[in-house]
Amino acid sequence: MYIGTQLSGDKLEQVGDRYLRQLAQLGIVHVCVDPVGSPYDWTRDILARHMDRIQTAGLVLDMVQLPLSSAGIDKVRSPGIILGQEPDRERELDGICHLIEMLGSLGIKAAKYNFNILGIPRTPSERGRGGAVLSTYRADQVLDAGSVTRAGQVSADQMWERITYFLERVVPVAEASKVRLAC
């Protein structure tokens, strides 16, 4: 069985290296764990030190998150790409392409991204078996379907144009760098 995990750099700083060692003790080998800070600020040296940290814990860094997370438009680090707004979109795309090239040069084989405006809607957490805190979604508690984000009303055609623009810029760089993209 293939078991992996994912962790943001901020969360890694909270849980520390002990958590990484526990993952290895549980038999987890492949992880998606980001370095601390904005992906736009990561350097080759930061990524190399991060890989060493992961390997020291007995793990393999399989992928990192591009600065297009599932956080939603108000928290995502690349709003220009999601909103299709120039000149921010070009600057953000240049940064992502540079990041992918660095990943490839270090042998990090994959990068993941999310391309959405809403993020992942959730309602308040609930308790589950053994007192576990559960991420929860209750449709009857979600905001009106008519409410909008700062993106305003976005048609399917507009969203597909933005996705296509992103992919046309990023996929050739990923292919040349031998980095797989995961969405």
Locations of regions flagged by a protein language model:
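N-terminal substrate-binding region of glycoside hydrolase catalytic domains
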Residues: 25-44, 62, 67-87
